[in-house]
Amino acid sequence: MRSSAASDVYKRQTVTRAGFGVAGLSEKTYKTVLNTNMGALYSPSLSAQVVDGACYLINYELDLNSPENANAATNGYLTATISVADEITKGQPVFYNVPDSASLLQNEIPVKNLFSNGDYGVYVDGYLFFFITMDMFKDQKNSYTLYWDRSKEPTTVENIPTYDLFLRVAKVADGTGSAASSIGEVRAFNIKSVLESVNSSEANKGSTKFNLKVNYLNTINEKDSTDLKWSSYTVQFLVEKNS
């Protein structure tokens, strides 16, 4: 399954870019690979750099015409030059007991901006990746929870089934410094099983696409903590037909 922003591997012959990768094993060769929006990527040094199941920000160079990639379909991966930059912390997905969006959570903080990057990969190997920007102190620690009430049916927006999710961020440890500044963090959320279920349901209905509308708390009135304003970011997925 892929988001509508996912890239077509074969539109370009040589690719140099940054992206998200989820470490795993090739089903055909059992070699360590990074699953990306360009497919599974392999490099001989990967096994010493990554941990199975972990998410990473990577830089890579991929030549689709190289001899190593002549048998990519047989191998189950593309060979690339890969530099692993950072491991990405995983957020917590919750599909039940969704808190009331009209009330603040304990130590909840607003999100200035939320977005994803199609070139990096919006949805990769079961994980939804987001760039999240907030005003916070250096070294401040936060918890990131993505709520999705699966008991609720989707709404229809411009003839597209749209599911509401809620990203909520709470401070869990103070940072340092005299003033807060705008800081961005990346988080990955594993929603594979639920997304596959939604895809199957939408395929049975004859849908060709569906949206995930991620709502996030954008501002809190300093004089009235019950005055909350929400913004949203929408990710669109193409429906894969049931086999």
Question: What kind of region is each of these model predictions?
Answer:
Residues 112-181:
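Short helix-loop boundary/capping segments
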Residues 62-75, 215-229:
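Short acidic/polar inter-strand loop motif in beta-rich domains
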Residues 223-243:
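Short beta-strand elements
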Residues 33-49:
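Beta-strand/loop nucleic-acid-binding surfaces
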Residues 68-135:
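Surface-exposed beta-loop interaction hotspot
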Residues 1-6, 10:
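Single conserved hydrophobic/aromatic residue that forms the stacking wall/gate
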Residues 48-70:
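Flexible glycine-rich surface loops and low-complexity tracts that mediate binding to linear polymers
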Residues 172-217:
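Short, solvent-exposed, Trp/other aromatic-anchored flexible loops in extracytoplasmic proteins
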